[in-house]
Swiss-Prot record:
PROSITE patterns: RIBOSOMAL_S12 (PS00055). Pfam families: Ribosom_S12_S23. It comes from the Bacteria. HAMAP family: Ribosomal_uS12_B. With S4 and S5 plays an important role in translational accuracy. Interacts with and stabilizes bases of the 16S rRNA that are involved in tRNA selection in the A site and with the mRNA backbone. Located at the interface of the 30S and 50S subunits, it traverses the body of the 30S subunit contacting proteins on the other side and probably holding the rRNA structure together. The combined cluster of proteins S8, S12 and S17 appears to hold together the shoulder and platform of the 30S subunit. This is Small ribosomal subunit protein uS12. Part of the 30S ribosomal subunit. Contacts proteins S8 and S17. May interact with IF1 in the 30S initiation complex. SUPFAM superfamilies: Nucleic acid-binding proteins (SSF50249). GO terms for cellular component: small ribosomal subunit. Residues 10-20 have a biased composition (Basic residues). GO terms for molecular function: rRNA binding; structural constituent of ribosome; tRNA binding.
Length: 123
């Protein structure tokens, strides 16, 4: 424990909060180009083939982003919009691709929770 004198001389060090999505550099979203689209397997208690993509952002940083929803139309060189938000059971995946924006189409046949998957209101 520091003495009062030591605190006057040095002061307390502020604890820096870790950024959740550093590659976005403070932006809400960033545009990027898919360099690889593939499936990944989740961590221990879960089992699936999660759809993910390596995306090179406009600032030059390459990140791994999750493709939400059932089915997608993304392939290499697709232009996508990337937002923050990790996938708990995929280590290293800290970003999501925004469905219904740029080249990523909305989820086909989606009726509920449509705004999260870029689906227009059915007629």
């Amino acid at each position: 424990m520091p003495t009062i004198n030591q605190l006057i001389r040095k002061g307390r060090k502020k604890v820096k909060k870790k950024k959740t999505a550093p590659a976005l550099q403070g932006s809400p979203q960033k545009r990027g180009v898919c360099t690889r689209v593939y499936t990944a397997t989740p961590k221990k208690p879960n089992s699936a083939l999660r759809k993910v993509a390596r995306v090179r952002l406009t600032n030059g940083i390459e990140v791994t982003a999750y493709i939400p929803g059932i089915g997608h139309n993304l392939q290499e060189h697709s232009v996508v919009l990337v937002r923050g938000g990790r996938v708990k059971d995929l280590p290293g995946v800290r970003y999501h691709i925004v469905r219904g924006a740029l080249d990523a189409a909305g989820v086909e046949g989606r009726k509920q929770g449509r705004s999260k998957y870029g689906v227009k209101k059915p007629k």
